[in-house]
A protein has these predicted regions:
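Alpha-helical transmembrane segments and their juxtamembrane interface "caps"
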Residues: 1-235
């Protein structure tokens, strides 16, 4: 168990205690607010991402900081046309790149479908650049919209609870609230782990950070099996 695992357990414990204290109904509404916030973030993410792409200066700045082609270990492949690279070569290149999740999957899909052909993008290096910056932008926009909607819903829920006070169940209210608190904590962890590919992309391949992730018990679930990251488009 490493620091990431300890942090995960602490977060789950805090959410469990919050659910225990707040009770079933408040915890249920808060969990519902998470789900609504996620759905709205997914719905409006393309609009926000297009807004960023339409700003040339902002988009170029993000392209500069992500610089996906640096993950290609063989410089000869950076300028190679994707049509000249075999599927086995591509598989080896992506495998050796040690890309943050879900970059490898999105790059493979974009190359297979030639997703950026209409923009005149043909080289492997540019496909790495464009795909990684698109995933990067989509994650940022998704998290920003989620945070905004969640904040608004939190004010509404807390205001209603303060004005009328949600009733308690006759039995098991606190325990059910604690269970919902743990579930909400899991959603919160999925959201927090969405920051990991952003950090790894900007900071580069730090061996210490990568080692912590690789040896974490919980990262296999909250990071590599993150259903929210899997929903982030790469184009």
């Amino acid at each position: 168990m490493n620091p990431i695992d300890i942090a995960v357990l602490v977060i789950l414990a805090l959410f469990a205690l919050a659910g225990l204290y707040r009770g079933f109904l408040t915890s249920l509404f808060n969990l519902g607010a998470y789900l609504v916030s996620i759905l709205l973030a997914l719905l409006f993410m393309p609009l926000g991402a297009n807004g960023i792409r339409s700003s040339e200066s902002l988009y170029n700045m993000m392209l500069y900081y992500t610089e996906g082609s640096e993950y290609i270990t063989n410089a000869e492949y950076v300028r190679a046309d994707i049509s000249s690279i075999s599927s086995q070569e591509l598989s080896d290149i992506i495998s050796n790149a040690h890309l943050p999740y879900p970059m490898a999957k999105e790059i493979s899909e974009n190359i297979a479908t030639e997703a950026f052909a209409d923009q005149g993008v043909t080289t492997l290096g540019d496909y790495f650049n464009q795909t990684i910056v698109c995933v990067f932008i989509n994650i940022l926009v998704f998290l920003a919209i989620f945070a905004l909607v969640r904040l608004i819903l939190a004010f509404v829920i807390n205001g209603v609870d303060y004005a009328w006070s949600f009733p308690l169940l006759r039995s098991g209210d606190s325990l059910l609230g604690m269970g919902l608190g743990v579930l909400r904590g899991m959603f919160a962890l999925f959201l927090l782990f969405m920051l990991l590919p952003i950090g790894l992309t900007i900071l580069g391949q730090f061996e210490l950070v990568q080692a912590l992730v690789d040896h974490s018990i919980f990262s296999a679930f909250f990071y590599r099996s993150n259903f929210l990251l899997a929903l982030m488009p790469g184009a």
